[in-house]
Amino acid sequence: MNIAQVAKQFGLTAATLRYYERVGLIPPVKRKDSGIRDYDEEDIKWIEFIKCMRNAGLSIEALIEYTTLFTEGDRTVEARKNILADERQRLIEKRKEIDETIKRLDTKIKDYDGKLRENEAKLKSRPKTESLHGSVEQRR
């Protein structure tokens, strides 16, 4: 696949794919004799992995380190596992923060629901002749 096809498949730009390769987020992509990148199935798997990890909030630095270690072979399995475990823990902590924020928002929304119900009850309890501008007699 060429860069335009891969970019379209993943909703990325060609510039982003070039950047991923340049900074080491993905291993170097093979090229045709003409110099055009020729993405194979392994490259596609790397892009899927990087996109998934970036969407989850992993830092570019952590992913570059992971990719670098991967290219060094099986002797780096433990280090790669540690990177992923550290990032997983960071995401768990982030999820806790998000859950707490959602709880606070839910509380505030309930508070506002209560205020809205109070205001509606006040409006319904007013005499029919009274409006926001006073009673009909007061306006004459």
Swiss-Prot record:
Q: Which residues bind DNA?
A: 3-22
- GO terms under biological process: regulation of DNA-templated transcription
In the UniProt record for this chain, what is stated about the effect of gene disruption? Answer: Loss of expression of the adhA-yraA operon in response to formaldehyde and methylgloxal.
Which positions are tagged coiled coil? Answer: 75-125
Q: Where is this region: Disordered?
A: 120-140
Arranged from A to Z, the UniProt key words for this protein are:
Activator, Coiled coil, DNA-binding, Stress response, Transcription, Transcription regulation
Instruction: Give the result of C52A, as annotated.
Output: Required to activate transcription of the adhA-yraA operon
Q: Which Pfam families match?
A: MerR_1 (PF13411)
Which SMART domains does this entry report, sorted A to Z? Answer: HTH_MERR
Source species, please?
Bacillus subtilis (strain 168)
- Does the keyword field hold Transit peptide? no
The UniProt GO MF terms for this protein read: DNA binding; DNA-binding transcription factor activity
Gene that encodes the chain: adhR
Chain's role:
Transcriptional regulator involved in the response to aldehyde stress. Binds to the promoter region of the adhA-yraA operon, the yraC and its own promoter region; binding is unchanged in the presence of aldehydes.
**InterPro entries assigned to the protein according to its UniProt record, in alphabetical order:** DNA-bd_dom_put_sf, MerR-type_HTH_dom, MerR_fam
- Superkingdom per UniProt: Bacteria
Q: Which residues form the HTH merR-type domain?
A: 1-69
Induction field: By aldehyde stress, positively regulates its own expression.
Protein name from the UniProt record: HTH-type transcriptional regulator AdhR
